[in-house]
């Protein structure tokens, strides 16, 4: 499901939601809310803040050290620079919903 499909899912009046608040969102409001949440998560992660939303999951930054790798095409050795890797770890409610 892409972003547009997810916004439609959030505002679908025929969908069986547990919470009535989902049914009151317009597509424009849903898009604004989603953009606000995503931009806030990106901004917090960019500032090296971890985000933990109980039950949903956590967003963290993991630092990856510089290392030596190989070009898969030629087999030549190459240096891979250090970088920060954003990660998401699902919470208990998210895991339970998937199983």
UniProtKB/Swiss-Prot annotation:
SUPFAM superfamilies: IHF-like DNA-binding proteins (SSF47729). Disulfide bonds: none annotated. InterPro entries: Hist_DNA-bd, Histone-like_DNA-bd_CS, IHF-like_DNA-bd_dom_sf. GO terms for biological process: chromosome condensation. Pfam families: Bac_DNA_binding (PF00216). GO terms for molecular function: DNA binding; structural constituent of chromatin. It comes from the Bacteria. Keywords: DNA condensation, DNA-binding. SMART domains: BHL (SM00411). Transmembrane segments: none annotated. Residues 67-86 are annotated as: Disordered. Homodimer. Belongs to the bacterial histone-like protein family. Histone-like DNA-binding protein which is capable of wrapping DNA to stabilize it, and thus to prevent its denaturation under extreme environmental conditions. PANTHER family: DNA-BINDING PROTEIN HU, DNA-BINDING PROTEIN HU-BETA. This is DNA-binding protein HU. It comes from Rickettsia felis (strain ATCC VR-1525 / URRWXCal2) (Rickettsia azadi).
């Amino acid at each position: 499901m892409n972003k547009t499909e997810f916004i439609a899912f959030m505002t679908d009046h025929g969908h069986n939601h547990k919470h009535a608040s989902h049914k009151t969102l317009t597509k424009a409001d849903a898009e604004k809310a989603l953009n606000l949440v995503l931009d806030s998560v990106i901004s917090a992660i960019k500032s090296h803040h971890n985000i933990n939303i109980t039950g949903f999951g956590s967003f963290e930054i993991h630092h990856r050290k510089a290392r030596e790798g190989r070009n898969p095409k030629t087999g030549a050795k190459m240096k891979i620079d250090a970088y920060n890797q954003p990660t998401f770890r699902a919470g208990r409610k998210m895991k339970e919903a998937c199983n």
